Regions:
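A cross-kingdom marker for long, charged
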Residues: 139-164
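Short coil/linker segments at helix-helix boundaries
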Residues: 1-17, 27-63, 73-108, 124-137, ...
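"A position-specific structural signal for the A-helix of alpha-solenoid helical repeats
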Residues: 24, 31, 70, 77, ...
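Surface-exposed substrate-engagement region within the catalytic domains
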Residues: 104, 112, 116
Length: 164
């Protein structure tokens, strides 16, 4: 993931106004941060870099559904890992912003299985069992989606496995 993030940084230098250069920078840093400890990720400043790249993506292309999904997960994961107070003060993580980004992602990509899966994951991180019915409903919707490509097929199968 770090190599891919570095390639995205090169793409940002060459194409600073390309939203996907910024999105894939955030995406790969985010995936990398999920593979290391929260302490290590915080020390490396990954949270701020992810937020900056996602914000730039959305500045360039406000209807970028995947960036809205990722921004929603950014807020949800920060809150889940370090709490609302510290996450909010340090990284600007906010439940309302997370929910707004998930809502926009669904608005821009209403049939996308990954948007529904990540929204479900975000709801669970933010609310736990209190929103279990909503989490389940989103996974059911994702599992019943029609795949447009191989990646969506894998997403649908993932949603189905969550329901078993």
């Amino acid at each position: 993931f770090l190599e891919a993030a570095e390639r995205a940084e090169q793409a940002i230098e060459e194409m600073p106004d390309d939203p996907n250069s910024h999105y894939f920078h955030a995406f790969n840093l985010g995936r990398y941060s999920q593979s290391i400890s929260i302490v290590k990720a915080l020390k490396q400043g990954i949270g701020g870099k992810v937020q900056k790249s996602l914000s730039r993506t959305l500045d360039l292309l406000p209807e970028h559904a995947d960036a809205h999904t990722a921004m929603g997960m950014y807020h949800a994961e920060i809150i889940d890992k370090i709490g609302k107070l510290v996450g909010g003060m340090t990284y600007g993580a906010d439940v309302k912003q997370a929910m707004e980004h998930f809502r926009k992602a669904l608005e821009f990509a209403p049939h996308s299985p990954i948007v529904k899966i990540e929204y479900a994951n975000g709801l669970y991180l933010l609310y736990g069992d209190k929103r279990w019915d909503d989490v389940s409903e989103l996974n059911v919707e994702a599992s019943e989606a029609k795949a447009l490509d191989a990646m969506e097929r894998l997403d649908i199968e993932s949603a189905r496995s969550e329901l078993e």
